Amino acid sequence: MSNHDPISDMLTRIRNASQKKHTTTTIPGSKMSLSIAKVLQKEGFISDINEEGEGYKSQIILGLKYSGKNKFPTIRSMQRVSKPGLRIYKNTRGLPKVLGGLGVAIISTSKGVMSDRDARKQGIGGEVLCYVY
């Protein structure tokens, strides 16, 4: 089966693994997936990132974070915003604040993939890939 939207596939794998309280999850490797994973790690949603394999067989292993005795997932929701059929672009002023600043929007800009906070600091806009909170 071909995967037409690897970003949605990545978000779904992370969401499913965190709901089942898995400690790690594996996603197919790509530059975009790795960039998104680095933003998630920087923002404190995942614990670690490991790359395995080369070329088309590469995989990224993400360590998921939980809090409290009941292992409540740090990622409560992940929503894909810009889709292959309908791309969503925002300028600096139009960048959304997710949950009043408690969540993060992941933006693909001309300077790479970054969080909405970093994009605002640099004064650039871009494609809104997803919301994470």
UniProtKB/Swiss-Prot annotation:
**Gene3D superfamilies documented for this protein:** 3.30.1370.30, 3.30.1490.10
Among the GO biological process terms of this entry, one is: translation
SUPFAM superfamilies tied to this protein: Ribosomal protein S8 (SSF56047)
Quote the cellular component terms of the Gene Ontology held in the record.
ribonucleoprotein complex; ribosome
Q: Which UniProt keywords apply?
A: Ribonucleoprotein, Ribosomal protein, RNA-binding, rRNA-binding
| InterPro entries linked to this entry | Ribosomal_uS8 (IPR000630), Ribosomal_uS8_CS (IPR047863), Ribosomal_uS8_sf (IPR035987)
Instruction: List residues traversing the bilayer.
Output: none
Keyword Isomerase assigned: no
UniProt KW Acetylation keyword: no
One MF term in GO for this entry? rRNA binding
Task: Share what the entry says about its subunit structure, partners included.
Answer: Part of the 30S ribosomal subunit. Contacts proteins S5 and S12.
Output the HAMAP family linked to this UniProt entry: Ribosomal_uS8_B
Primary role: One of the primary rRNA binding proteins, it binds directly to 16S rRNA central domain where it helps coordinate assembly of the platform of the 30S subunit.
The record's similarity note reads:
Belongs to the universal ribosomal protein uS8 family.
This one is known as Small ribosomal subunit protein uS8
What's the source species for this entry?
A: Prochlorococcus marinus (strain AS9601)
